[in-house]
Design a protein with these regions (language model features):
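Functional transmembrane-helix hotspots
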Residues: 101-136
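Alpha-helical transmembrane segments with an aromatic anchor "belt"
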Residues: 70-91
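Juxtamembrane interface at the cytosolic side of transmembrane helices
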Residues: 71, 177-190
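Transmembrane alpha-helical insertion/packing segments
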Residues: 1-72
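C-terminal halves and exits of single transmembrane alpha-helices
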Residues: 86-108
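Hydrophobic alpha-helical transmembrane segments of multipass membrane transporters and ion channels
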Residues: 15, 19-26, 89, 93-97, ...
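Individual transmembrane alpha-helix segments
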Residues: 147-174
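Short membrane-interface loop/juxtamembrane segments of multi-pass integral membrane proteins
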Residues: 77-80, 130-157
Length: 190
């Protein structure tokens, strides 16, 4: 009986992870388009809006997926750790899909993806420096931090970038699920 529930955990998590991984890919595709085609300070606000939408859609997918998992697998046996376990698997499967996408992008489709991102931020910092009231010292400080980060990122192999994304997204999901699991453990009302 326990093995069946464990299999169902993976099945439910893989299904929701497919949706979440698809969203991560769509989000990154939009970001890649912005990085390579739009060079303005306004694009930064577009990316910030995309981040907010991404968080909201991620929370929606977690909530809906957990709801299905509670209804189909857990029935009345809902606990914080079971919901947290499900959320971890959901993010792990989504992150695996996303890491494969990143690897394929960096090796086949768009090897210049990270360079485009660096060039985008270089242009934005240059534009911000010409704005009235801009603090040159602060911008130079931010730019030096970005340059160091991108220098490290650009020196990594596509495999390393993909593995770092796998680890990073899974860790992000785990911490997000630590909080969301508190609210998603309530019993199912009939």
């Amino acid at each position: 009986m326990e093995g069946t529930n464990e299999g169902n955990v993976f099945s439910c998590a893989m299904r929701a992870g497919l949706y979440l991984g698809g969203w991560f890919i769509l989000r990154d595709s939009i970001e890649m388009f912005v990085y390579s085609n739009v060079v303005s300070v306004g694009a930064v606000f577009l990316l910030a809006l995309l981040s907010i939408v991404s968080l909201l859609l991620t929370l929606y997918i977690i909530t809906k997926g957990t709801d299905v998992y509670k209804r189909e697998v857990l029935k009345e046996n809902v606990s914080y750790f079971k919901v947290l376990n499900y959320g971890f698997y959901l993010f792990f499967f989504a992150s695996m899909i996303y890491a494969v996408f990143i690897f394929l992008c960096l090796t086949l489709f768009n090897p210049e993806m990270l360079s485009d991102q660096k060039n985008f931020y270089d242009s934005v910092f240059t534009q911000m420096g010409t704005m009235e009231g801009a603090s040159t010292e602060m911008l130079n400080s931010f730019k030096s931090h970005y340059d160091k980060g991108f220098e490290g990122l650009l020196s990594q192999s596509p495999r390393d970038v993909a593995m770092n994304n796998l680890f990073g997204e899974t860790t992000y999901g785990f911490f997000l699920c630590l909080v969301t699991s508190i609210f998603l453990t309530k019993k199912i009302s009939k």
